[in-house]
């Protein structure tokens, strides 16, 4: 009976105990706390564990990257050990789809914040929320309507001032970044089709070019931030701009790292035309990053262009 039970086929495998979920959660907490302290005090504040906002954020973010690499290592070992049966692969796909769906909702929140501020910059809301005693002003203050008028000057984008020198020209560097990401989406698709056709050389070159384009996009975004005519603090435009584009930039960095892992796996002879979910998941994620940028470019850079910054 024991031998029969041992030889029984199972569609699922029991994963070994792993420290990465707990470690990753701790690092995510440190990143969130560090980001909050950093944004509220722009580098000051009391911090946590002797670290101020930027330091705490950096420790947490580096911890997240380390967790990703180590967790990917373990998953790759499971795949090479034959643990990823067709049923397991199917549910890995479901998991990746749900993860991307949650990321979509994450960016919906930032688009919501941006459009709420841009459509009602003067603090006038179409819904007059009143209490039984008619305390309209108090209610407006609770939802941020009163302060918004002071922060935006009643205009979106804010008019040029000492703290706001203008927005970016969407047909300059933002357009270049758009072309870079669209090209990277093409090259990662080329790599995928090359893999399906057994073209290992095309797979490697497609991945390498995509990684280079991802790094180039990040460099251009960093240059744009350095030369921005406004800062994060002081007005809603800067806050929503840097949060939306900044989180997208973080996703580009993560996606580039994801593809880099796939590139080194391809060099090591991993992936076959029939079994390559690791690369497929990275390609899905990269296409998601592309689509989000198209919405950011259209909504924030083009529609919300306002007065372009004079260089």
State where each predicted segment sits.
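...captures the hydrophobic TM-helix bundle architecture rather than a specific catalytic motif
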Residues: 1-311
